Design a protein with these regions (language model features):
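N-terminal active-site segment of His-dependent metallophosphoesterases
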Residues: 1-67
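Extended active-site neighborhood of metal-dependent phosphoesterases/phosphodiesterases
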Residues: 28, 64-164, 168, 189-210, ...
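Catalytic domains of carbohydrate-active enzymes, especially glycoside hydrolases
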Residues: 41-54, 336-365, 375, 379-386, ...
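Active-site clefts of carbohydrate-active enzymes
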Residues: 182, 240, 245, 438-456, ...
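Aromatic- and carboxylate-lined catalytic core of secreted/periplasmic carbohydrate-active enzymes
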Residues: 265-266, 273-278, 300-302, 540-631
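Catalytic-core region of carbohydrate-active enzymes that cleave or remodel glycosidic bonds
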Residues: 475-561, 643-646
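Carbohydrate-binding surface patches
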Residues: 604-660, 688, 692
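C-terminal beta-strand-rich structural cap/linker in extracellular carbohydrate-active enzymes
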Residues: 665-695
Length: 695
């Protein structure tokens, strides 16, 4: 179970409020929607009920030299007036001018611009305490300006940090010090020298817990020494030059109105750590003075830092720490190919609460990726490596040096002469001090031929039918001492629920552990699996069995869509890391079943229409997961496992895609809008002793 946070706060950035409704000085329609999107964010903040909110700047869109600045400022205050908690404001470059540079596209920061901001919004830098934490709001545009205000802020900051050095310190500014590396060259989206190094030295000296910045309208996470560095997305529009990070065509407005890129941060402060949730807004808007019903905000989910259970892991097929050079665009950067990393897959993983990541060993060999592994380890992730054949001496050295980053090593071998690998496997196990799991190579060269047909494939993992092969292997002298367990591949023709439990139990009787790779691809490499309902069912089964076997590592393949090449299929998220149906199901099951995973048992499976029903129990709770293959009328749902609960009090119906909840009686009658309708969605029915999942 997780503990409650001591307090929470939210962070908003780059709202770009216009001086008029549905009118903007920018040529893009997304900018004209800014005011409505800001209103939606205020409504969202009120539902999250943070203790306070910090805005990182670009409060308004008109730059300081425009006569519409004051009008936009008044409208900003009008939009944020309904906010039910304190609001702390920082200036962005649209509010007081660009950072000091001879090439920036707008006027740079100066004293008149700052006085104008102070008139409408207050001080450009400040600090405050909350509980045992200290919050520092920095005017980043002042750095390198040469203004007297820069000297004043520097003296104030040095004294403020020293006075509060025994507190947990969090820092906030508009410009990020960097977006990829502390030593990266200057560009439009970072701080220049010497101000950057000055700030980084202070951050290191006072062991700042996290620094949050905006400006880039994109999501980035980095870690330098003991500090987390976050860059926030905008609530209004995406900086479409960063569409280059995605290896698919741009979204609407050539990427600027990419709805999955908008969001706010909801930060939970615990006694010993913090967890940062990126809450998507999807570009939602609320019109002024319409009186229309306001939508309910769904807040269910855990960050990996918040949970003790692991759940279902994911196989990381795509490069996930790759640094990409982006073309100079002519809009903001014209002299340098800016480098950036696509952190949106990471954002999606944290949104789902994924902890376990399966990586090829070559990720650990790359210093850049290895640093990323180390950073994410601090965020609660665990890493499981795999490789083909016996590792080289260089690989063994790396494994020994960084064994603290790794949970286990899977070694895949050809099965023609497995006895020849016994001594090398034993030597590796003794040397690297890691659990070693053995996996079998499966390829088209060894497969049975279908008449005159031949299809190329390379797979790995023992098939569920090959336990006899394993028993024969373990009968070899020295085999038991050479490895800790075996890896099974659960292909599309195998049932994850029954096979994983059966194989885990059988291997336990042999004194060996198991790992499983559950695939989503079809068996034919030319056919695409794009049935999101079928995929969600499979992810639901794999998640459920993972919670019931907390000491067994189970991974799902695939995380991100494979939309080209062999075995094309949908994953949990699309190529822009927007969640598909399966990602929502994963997140909801992780939230509801995860806290009970230490004592969760699968009690039975029954047929329901053309689908199945899985009964689960833990002390004080019972669950029923229903996986129909077609639409079903929930008001006529007949499940044998419900018979013991027909006299129970009304439960709650959960939609595992939207997170929506409503009351429901166990005989199928509903107190809300969902149960009596035909649905092809994911649901849960719950009371204090019963939860029923309906997919």
């Amino acid at each position: 179970m997780t503990s409650d946070p001591v307090f929470t706060f939210c962070i908003v950035s780059d709202g770009h409020v216009n001086p008029e409704e549905d009118v903007s000085s920018s040529p893009w329609n997304s900018n004209r929607m800014a005011n409505g999107r800001n209103r939606y964010v205020v409504h969202m903040l009120n539902q999250l009920k943070p203790d306070f909110v910090i805005h990182l700047g670009d409060l308004i869109h008109p730059v300081p030299s425009l006569p519409s600045y004051a009008t936009a400022a008044r409208l900003f205050h009008e939009i944020f007036k309904p906010l039910n908690c304190p609001l702390h404001l920082l200036p962005g470059n649209h509010d007081i001018g660009d950072k000091p540079s001879s090439w920036t596209p707008a006027e740079i920061v100066n004293d008149p611009f700052m006085r104008q901001f102070e008139t409408h919004f207050g001080s450009t830098y400040s600090s405050f305490d909350f509980d045992d934490c200290h919050f520092v709001l920095l005017n980043s545009q002042l750095l390198n300006s040469g203004l007297q205000a820069e000297k004043d802020q520097a003296a104030w900051l040095a004294g403020d940090l020293e006075q509060n050095r025994n507190k947990r310190i969090f820092m906030f500014c508009h410009y990020p010090p960097f977006i990829t590396s502390p030593d990266e060259p200057e560009h439009y989206d970072n701080l220049s020298e010497p101000g950057r190094s000055w700030l980084m030295e202070l951050i290191d000296r006072y062991r700042v817990k996290a620094l949050f910045s905006g400006h880039v309208h994109n999501y980035f996470y980095n870690r330098s020494n003991d500090t987390d560095f976050f860059v926030l997305p905008s609530i209004t529009f995406f900086r479409h030059d960063y569409s280059e990070l995605f290896k698919v065509g741009p979204a609407e407005e050539f990427g600027r109105n990419d709805l999955g890129r908008f969001g706010i941060f909801w930060v939970k402060i615990y006694k010993t750590h913090h967890a940062v949730h990126c809450m998507r807004t999807e570009g939602s808007t609320i019109k002024a003075n319409t009186g229309e019903p306001l939508p309910e905000i769904q807040t269910h989910g855990f960050h990996p830092r918040e949970i003790s259970w692991s759940g279902l892991g994911i196989d990381m097929r795509y490069p996930w720490a790759e640094i990409i050079e982006m073309p100079y665009s002519g809009g903001l950067d014209e002299f340098y190919r800016k480098k950036a990393r696509n952190d949106h897959p990471l954002c999606a993983m944290w949104e789902m609460g994924v902890k376990k990541l399966r990586l090829p060993i070559h990720d650990l060999l790359d210093p850049q990726v290895r640093d990323r592994v180390s950073a994410l380890k601090q965020m609660g992730h665990t890493f499981y490596l795999f490789m083909y054949d016996i590792p080289s001496s260089r690989m063994i050295d790396i494994l020994k040096q960084h064994a603290d980053l790794i949970e286990s090593l899977e070694i895949i071998i050809p099965w023609k002469s497995p006895e020849t690998f016994l001594k090398p496997l034993k030597a590796i196990r003794d040397t690297v001090n890691l659990p070693i799991f053995l996996s079998k190579l499966q390829s088209s060269a060894d497969a049975e031929k279908e008449g005159g047909r031949f299809k190329h494939f390379i797979k790995h993992g023992f098939q569920p039918s090959e336990t006899g092969v394993i028993r024969e292997y373990l009968s070899l002298k020295g085999a038991t001492e050479a490895i800790d367990g075996f890896v099974f591949r659960i292909g599309r023709l195998s049932d994850p629920l029954t096979e994983i439990h059966r194989l885990s139990k059988e291997m336990t009787t042999l004194g060996k552990k198991t790992q499983f790779l559950v695939t989503l691809a079809k068996e034919n490499p030319a056919l695409c699996e794009e049935d999101d309902h079928t995929i969600a069912d499979r992810v639901a089964e794999a998640s459920t069995v993972a919670f019931s076997l907390p000491d067994t590592s189970i991974f799902i393949d695939t995380f991100i869509d494979m939309d080209r090449g062999y075995f094309p299929r949908h994953g949990l998220v699309d190529r822009r890391s927007n969640p598909r149906r399966a990602a929502h199901v994963y997140r909801q099951l992780n939230t509801i079943l995860g806290p009970h995973s230490e004592n969760l048992n699968i009690e039975g499976i029954e047929t329901v229409g053309s689908g199945k029903c899985i009964s689960l129990k833990s002390p004080g709770f019972a669950w029923i997961l229903i996986l129909p293959e077609t639409e079903m009328d929930l008001s006529r749902l007949e499940i044998q496992a419900l018979n013991d609960h027909l006299d129970s009090s009304p439960g709650t119906l959960f939609n595992l895609v939207s997170g929506e909840r409503s009351g429901v009686q166990l005989d199928g009658s509903s107190q809300g809008p969902l149960a009596a309708e035909k649905k092809h969605h994911e649901f849960i029915i719950a009371d204090p002793s019963l939860l029923c999942f309906v997919l």
